Structures are given as structure tokens and as C-alpha cells.
Regions:
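Cys/His-rich metal-chelating microdomains
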Residues: 39, 45, 89, 101-104, ...
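Short N-terminal binding/cap micro-motifs at the start of the first secondary-structure element
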Residues: 10-16, 43-44
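Short gly/ser/thr-rich secondary-structure transition/capping motifs
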Residues: 13-19, 51-52
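Short structural boundary motif marking the start of a folded domain
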Residues: 1-4
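Cytochrome P450 core scaffold surrounding the K-helix E-X-X-R motif
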Residues: 44-50
Length: 134
């Protein structure tokens, strides 16, 4: 698949993203693979690219405003079928058991993980995401 990969932190005008060919990602247990139809760019993406948000994963495929169709299912996925339309959340994972998760404010979870920041996002032909965050 083709993907835009951020390999270094730099100002956007220094072109820190590179178009590369990568192997198609395979969904693991509880994950779906999305064939990306569109991925928006917002200020958060620019903060990630330019290093305004510290301690994220490199290299990374940015992009968290993802829409597309389910392309493949990992084991134990029950809520989606191939061809389903999906949107992918910025929030990608939480602990599920802290006070914030239990009261429905998962975005405050101290163990939260984010699409295009901790894990690869949607600036690619394919993206793998947890079923519960699509």
C-alpha cells in the first residue's frame, strides 16, 4: 500500500512526510482493516508533524479523521462485515477500567492511545483499527 510516513519532526514547509510503499497491514484479534476513502487534515495533525505534541511514535502514518470501508476482519470481530462504511476515531484505545472510562469520559483515560499519534493513522490506502474505536 502507499502511505505518507512521518519519519522526523519538522515544520510542514520542510516536507517531513514521505510517500512510501509498505506491506498491507493485517488486522489482529479485535481489529478491522479499513480501505481509506478519505482522511482529513486538521491542526492536531500539524501539531504531531511539527512536534508540538511530545512523545509520539516515529515513524508514524499520521491522520485521524478517517473514513472508508471495512476491507478485512481480524479474529473475534463481530460488529462489522466487509464493505461496511466506517469512521475512525482519534481515540484509539483506553484501559476501560479507570474512573474516566467507567463514567464515559474515556478521552481522559491516563492510558489512552490515539490514531496517527501512537498508532498508524489514515494517510494511507489501508488502516488497521480496533473494532471498538471505529
Amino acid at each position: 500500500m502507499k502511505a505518507m510516513v512521518l519519519e522526523r519532526i519538522a515544520a510542514v514547509d520542510e516536507r517531513p512526510l514521505n510517500m512510501v510503499d509498505l506491506p498491507d497491514p493485517e488486522p489482529g484479534p479485535g481489529e478491522i482493516r479499513v480501505r481509506v476513502s478519505a482522511c482529513g487534515v486538521c491542526r492536531t495533525d500539524l501539531h504531531v508533524i511539527e512536534g508540538d505534541l511530545p512523545q509520539h511514535t516515529l515513524p508514524i502514518i499520521p491522520g485521524h479523521q478517517v473514513v472508508g470501508r471495512v476491507d478485512a476482519l481480524g479474529p473475534r470481530v463481530s460488529g462489522f462485515a466487509p464493505g461496511d462504511r466506517v469512521g475512525v476515531a482519534w481515540l484509539r484505545g483506553t484501559c476501560g477500567s479507570c474512573e474516566y472510562c467507567l463514567r464515559g469520559t474515556e478521552n481522559l483515560c491516563p492510558d489512552s492511545r490515539y490514531t496517527g499519534y501512537h498508532e498508524n493513522g489514515g494517510n494511507a490506502e489501508l488502516a488497521v483499527v480496533p473494532e471498538g474505536f471505529a
